[in-house]
Amino acid sequence: MKLWGGRFTHQVDDLVNTFNSSISFDSRMYKEDIIGSIAHVTMLGEEKIIPKEDSKKIASGLYEILDKLNQGVLKIDNSSEDIHSFIESTLTDYIGEEGKKLHTGRSRNDQVTLDTKLYLKGYIKILICEILNLEKTLLNLSSENKETIMPGYTHMQKAQPITFAHHILAYSEMFKRDISRLLDCYKRLDEMPLGSGALATTTYPINREKVSELLGFSKVTLNSLDSVSDRDYAIETLSCLSLLMMHLSRFSEEIIIWSTDEFKFIELDDSYSTGSSIMPQKKNPDVAELVRGKTGRVYGDLMTLLTVMKGLPLAYNKDMQEDKEALFDGLDTTLLSIKTFNGMIKTMKINKSLMKTSASSGFTNATDVADYLVKKGVAFRDAHEIVGNLILYCIDEGKSIDNLSLSEFKTFSNKFENDIYKAINLLTCIEERKVIGGPSISSINIQIEHLNNFIQESNEKLNFLK
């Protein structure tokens, strides 16, 4: 059944029907469409816009359809134009003429916006739950690796010694921001659009606040033109997902590097690796590589929506039907990526000894030698020059800083004493960095405590979301 057609004298071409149809992708919103319709028809009955007995009969029919769809007894007809027309035509088949009163006082324009917002509200909560599961994994990893020394890098060159916990907690901060962004996005999503009609509301005395209350929205939208032409909520969601995927991609890149034979910092579990069809020895980090690749896919979904919306006049235009495939793909891709990535890092093995050995080379304690001289009264710029010359000497002689004798140290400055050896010990280098945000154990403990509190607080916020 089509929801329109009275003014047409010819049947629409089959090719146009196929081109126009959205049932193949908007059918996933059948629950939201039915729940929204139940709230709408309940209001119609309470406001005496339709007889109350008709309202109850329609609601009962909608509940029956929902139950049968959930059980798989009723199958969605893919020849329908969209999920809205399928639900309404099925309702009329079930209960008769009263079903035709369901659409009183609304348009598909405000209906589809409502469905999408309801769907997104539920999906965002699922996404946040999965990010929190990932954060719990990072919390455990960092708690177990407070003293696991590794090299920190800038420009992919060894820079200063840090701990694996410090490195892992850097990503936890990124994911904390992702959760905060999604929660913030949820606030703007939480505005009920139904009642906006096609663009100019309706002449029926509907009660939008009642529908909003029934559906668990915090408020109603204030301008009907904006309500039906707005897709900011979808674009903002995809923006949040793009940033989240970027963080997963950066982490994945490091997982890939760390798992190479050249690094061997970690070993991925067999259950999260794949092999080669020709090279028997291969163990490939496909999960990390796919996360990295799928990030571009989510970026593409965002660009699709931005491009669709960039030149549209008010109010609704059919171009906006193109929002759902991109939105749903971005949601599904991100959710699967988070869950799979979490399993990968939860099961990977950490090679602590190789991390420490790597941190011991590459002059990662050079900055600490300069800081040592500063504490002895040497200006930092002079200390920097002295240590630069010392490093050049080490390179020429094939030595590390730790292997220099005191007399060799004194060749570069008479400020060097026996306590230099304690100052350049890697653990000392780390423990001296007690500043908030640093890699020392005391600082890491604070970061871990903050992460633990954040996880608990975020779970509490989730419980309060309608």
From Swiss-Prot:
Q: What Gene3D superfamilies does this protein map onto?
A: Fumarase/aspartase (C-terminal domain), Fumarase/aspartase (Central domain), Fumarase/aspartase (N-terminal domain)
GO biological processes = arginine biosynthetic process via ornithine; L-arginine biosynthetic process
Assigned keywords, A-Z? Amino-acid biosynthesis, Arginine biosynthesis, Cytoplasm, Lyase
Q: What GO CC terms are in its UniProt record?
A: cytosol
Q: What is its EC number?
A: 4.3.2.1
From the Swiss-Prot or TrEMBL record, state where the protein is found.
Cytoplasm
* InterPro entries xrefs: Arg_succ_lyase_C, Argininosuccinate_lyase, Fumarase/histidase_N, Fumarate_lyase_CS, Fumarate_lyase_fam, Fumarate_lyase_N, L-Aspartase-like
Single GO molecular function: argininosuccinate lyase activity
Name the Pfam families on file: ASL_C2, Lyase_1
Catalysed reaction, written as an equation: 2-(N(omega)-L-arginino)succinate = fumarate + L-arginine
Recorded metabolic or biological pathway in which this protein acts: Amino-acid biosynthesis; L-arginine biosynthesis; L-arginine from L-ornithine and carbamoyl phosphate: step 3/3
Q: Which family would the database say this protein is a member of? A: Belongs to the lyase 1 family. Argininosuccinate lyase subfamily.
List, alphabetically, the HAMAP family matched. Answer: Arg_succ_lyase
Q: Per its UniProt record, what NCBIfam families does this chain match?
A: argH
Q: What name does the UniProt record give this protein?
A: Argininosuccinate lyase
Which organism was this protein described from? Answer: Clostridium perfringens (strain 13 / Type A)
Question: Corresponding gene?
Answer: argH
